[in-house]
Amino acid sequence: MAKDKKFVEDITPMDEDFAQWYTDIVKKAELADYSSIKGCMIIRPNGYAIWENIQKYVDTKLKEYGHENVSMPIFIPENLLQKEKDHVEGFAPEVAWVTHGGDDELAERLCVRPTSETLFCEHYAKIVQSYKDLPKLYNQWCSVVRWEKTTRPFLRTTEFLWQEGHTIHETKEEAESHSLKILNMYSRLCEDMLAMPVVMGKKTEKEKFAGADDTYTIESLMHDGKALQAGTSHYLGQNFSKAFAIQFSDRNGKLEYPHYTTWAVTTRLIGAIIMVHGDDSGLKLPPRIAPTQAVIIPVAQHKEGVLEKAKELKERLAKVVRVKLDDSDKMPGWKYSEYEMKGIPLRIEIGPKDIEKNQAVLVRRDNREKTIVSLDEIEVKVQEMLDIIHNSMLEEARKSRDEKTYVAITMEEFEDIIENKPGFIKAMWCGDRACEDKIREVTGATSRCMPFEQEVVSDTCVCCGKKAKNLVYWGRAY
């Protein structure tokens, strides 16, 4: 029992060592474990179930929009990868290569996919002839490999899970509209399911996806004041279509190149959930994404009728929420700590006195508030409570982000904020790449996005003092 107690309690305080706190939660909440391969992880059932719920939401939305799922090969021939110059240069440092099949050296190296634009383009070139074939709306769920130098579970790993959408369209307007439609869906995923507020915007030329005309992004802020790119949607223009000779006959019989979009979210969203919502007691899962939304803990379960009532309660609640009954022989106090550490949104306690009064006690994970409810209306009350918890977690995360969002007019202010008050910095920018590079060199901060909701906090660039063009969110990032 002492060992079990230590397992539950031994989490490094986040203010003492945020990185170790994060690692402790990943391991102790049984989300993932380290693999023997550097930079790779084993996603355990608790972690994978969160990803499955993300998948379910995204897949349902994509199918509502008319997308179809496909599966592309994991290998890309070297000649295919090199067809789009900017694209291959952007990924070259991260590519893993297969050079042998068994004992035989391959005639051509095969890249282990870092992303699949080249494969989709090769396929689209074969199947598209007319405007009547458009749009093509494909998506795949898979893993990709990027040989990262610095890794951390979920946030940056050599291999990770994602969905990648690849669509081609008749017109630029249709493709751009589709890119933004997907970005809006990602934003709703984060806010409506993960209780995580995001800033929507456009990446600068320096930060956009290799080979894209425009990259749109949703940016989130972690508890330690670092930014995290939660999802991206790219308008690739006709760059890839031309490189791969994808052409169609338009409505006038003229050959044209389709307009391409690609977009993705990954398992790094699980890392974001940990770092936005977690506390020193462990994980704190938003109810709508939590694999288990409520756990029933019988108190004095050895007493007559308690376990039977708890089982009856589980049967009732299982019709409306994802619920678990813990009837193990561990002490209730140990169970409270364990499920708090694992982030279960709602704990339901029921003991002999509760049964006498026809009631149960609901305990929220987010603020530990207790509420007594009648067993006659517990299905409704539990669902209402889960919605309250979601809204409260979203509001708390938004408040934390807003409190850590600052305005800088000069470089002196910028440097002072970045060193002493980690968070987002809103500052004006002239649009010159040299200023963007200098800000990163001096402060370690990168441009996160030019938000769609622009405002003017100054007339001049924070770096050079020249006339400003855009408001930019800046920050140090994962």
Curated annotation (Swiss-Prot):
Pfam families recorded: HGTP_anticodon (PF03129), ProRS-C_1 (PF09180), tRNA-synt_2b (PF00587)
Q: Which GO terms describe its cellular component?
A: aminoacyl-tRNA synthetase multienzyme complex; cytoplasm
Q: Which reaction does it catalyse?
A: tRNA(Pro) + L-proline + ATP = L-prolyl-tRNA(Pro) + AMP + diphosphate
Q: Per its UniProt record, what SMART domains does this chain match?
A: ProRS-C_1
Among the GO biological process terms of this entry, one is: prolyl-tRNA aminoacylation
Which molecular function GO terms apply here? ATP binding; catalytic activity, acting on a protein; proline-tRNA ligase activity; transferase activity
Question: Where's it found, cell-wise?
Answer: Cytoplasm
Whether Signal counts among this entry's keywords is: no
- Name of the top EC class for this enzyme: ligase
Q: Quote the EC number.
A: 6.1.1.15
Keywords, A to Z, come to: Aminoacyl-tRNA synthetase, ATP-binding, Cytoplasm, Ligase, Nucleotide-binding, Protein biosynthesis
Top-rank taxon, per record: Bacteria
Q: Tell me where it mainly resides.
A: cytoplasm
Q: What does this protein do?
A: Catalyzes the attachment of proline to tRNA(Pro) in a two-step reaction: proline is first activated by ATP to form Pro-AMP and then transferred to the acceptor end of tRNA(Pro).
> What PANTHER family does this protein map onto?
BIFUNCTIONAL GLUTAMATE_PROLINE--TRNA LIGASE, PROLYL-TRNA SYNTHETASE
Family per record: Belongs to the class-II aminoacyl-tRNA synthetase family. ProS type 3 subfamily.
On subunit structure and binding partners, the annotation says: Homodimer.
Swiss-Prot/TrEMBL domain comment: Consists of three domains: the N-terminal catalytic domain, the anticodon-binding domain and the C-terminal extension.
What is the name attached to this protein's record? Proline--tRNA ligase
Species of the source? Clostridium botulinum (strain 657 / Type Ba4)
Gene designation: proS
